[in-house]
Amino acid sequence: EDMPKLIAIDLQPMAPIEGITTIQGDMTSMAKVEEILAHFTDGRKADLVISDGAPDVTGLHDMDEFMQAQLILAGLTVCTHILADGGTYVAKIFRGKDCALLYSQLKLFFKQVTCAKPKSSRNSSIEAFVVCQEYSPPEGFEPDDLSRVLHERAKGMLQEDAHGNALGTMGWPT
């Protein structure tokens, strides 16, 4: 009982590792999320969730950054169900010119959100890790509210031009 619960999920098959539950599949799939959650029905919570998943890159940086952000939010979905108060979430991120919305959304749930780039990573690489510490969801938050809460944060960050047209966080028309 005192042993940590370790669960790994990957699209590719994994060799079995003693003491680790492995799940093959896509963590953006609701069926796989439910499979992960089934391992936490005993009331225990995770202290740490790590995601180093990345989409197949297209070479279109804006698209790659968007797809990576969706993986981070899929991980956040899992966190809202299983992460203990004060817990940590670490995820691979593609640092782009406009990460403000994603950081803002993560800061709704974590007291500290920082970006860390390992020294071993090439300087030219946009790959880094977002480190989210001290999980503390908004008061009254229920995991099923996640989409609504993230959407409201996104709406709050949108600006309007002089004609009332919505502008993205970079000031471009949406």
Could you describe each region identified by the protein language model?
Residues 17-19, 34, 91-93, 101-103, ...:
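Intrinsically disordered, low-complexity regions enriched in proline, serine, glycine
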Residues 4, 26-27, 65, 69-70, ...:
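Aromatic/acidic cage segments in peptide-binding pockets
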Residues 4, 17, 31, 44, ...:
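Eukaryote-biased feature marking scaffold/signaling PDZ-domain proteins and nuclear chromatin regulators
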